[in-house]
């Protein structure tokens, strides 16, 4: 006896209701898509009368063939009376930046903190405007942070300039031009052995920072000790008129011609002045040198007398003074013409 296979169509349609046999077909079909003005008026009238509640009940009670979600979105995004229109204010933009840095892309939570704005509106405004502005600002900050390094790279080469302690920048090439004539004097300076002089008031106006005592003059430690166009620098008592440009017979001050003044270190020998000019005839005051010329017009080597070697003027602490008078007089007995007045 053969078994018949069951009909596949019968099994497939077994669980479905038979509409022809009086099945439940009374459920209305909901609408989708755009809202009509009539639907908007029904929803507004019901919401202003009854307020918010369950959106599925609102759709049914308002006589709308819409689902609850569609009614909620239509009311919140378009129909509520407190809805703001137009562009965002600068205060709202700052608040969106702040809330987005905390909440991220949680637009519904951000919208609850901006009255009158919807989450969809805030999201669209962020993606279209604020996100690009934030990216541009970050790029500008990155470029501005790298610009100081570029400006520092354009600064002058330290081999071409040096800066003294006073903040003045001078060129090394100018110093090299004065290398050979650094110790020259405008005219010959001669000292009369019969004229006494005082060491104390030797320097009255040198343009230095401080003058502690008559026997010591401290010069700022800036490598090259330059004092510019200085006239009537040294005041020497008892010296007569020894030249038109060396000694002033009225004020008894030593004035030299030239642009730059340099003071070498002189701790063992009394040296009056040095300047840049054409002729050089520098004489020491110590009689043990017998008024010997220390330099000539082209090159010189002063050695221990001035603390200079091969025309180099890079000195640490140049001074005029700090003599031990007792030891100096004991070692040099031939000082009858020098009258040192010490207070």
From Swiss-Prot:
Residues 1-33, 134-172 are annotated as: Disordered. SUPFAM superfamilies: Homeodomain-like. CDD domains: SANT. Residues 55-79, 107-130 bind DNA. Residues 1-16 have a biased composition (Basic and acidic residues). GO terms for cellular component: nucleus. Residues 27-79, 80-134 form the HTH myb-type domain. GO terms for molecular function: DNA-binding transcription factor activity; transcription cis-regulatory region binding. Keywords: Activator, DNA-binding, Nucleus, Repeat, Transcription, Transcription regulation. It is found in: Nucleus. GO terms for biological process: positive regulation of DNA-templated transcription; regulation of secondary cell wall biogenesis. Disruption phenotype: No visible phenotype under normal growth conditions, but the double mutant plants myb48 and myb83 nearly lack secondary wall thickening, stop growing after developing one to two pairs of small leaves and subsequently die. Its main location: nucleus. Residues 136-155 have a biased composition (Low complexity). The keyword GTP-binding does not apply. Transcription factor that acts as a molecular switch in the NAC012/SND1-mediated transcriptional network regulating secondary wall biosynthesis. Is directly activated by NAC012/SND1 and its close homologs, including NAC043/NST1, NAC066/NST2, NAC101/VND6 and NAC030/VND7. Is required for functional expression of a number of secondary wall-associated transcription factors and secondary wall biosynthetic genes involved in cellulose, xylan and lignin synthesis. Functions redundantly with MYB46 in the transcriptional regulatory cascade leading to secondary wall formation in fibers and vessels. PANTHER family: MYB DOMAIN PROTEIN 55, TRANSCRIPTION FACTOR MYB83. This is Transcription factor MYB83. It comes from Arabidopsis thaliana.
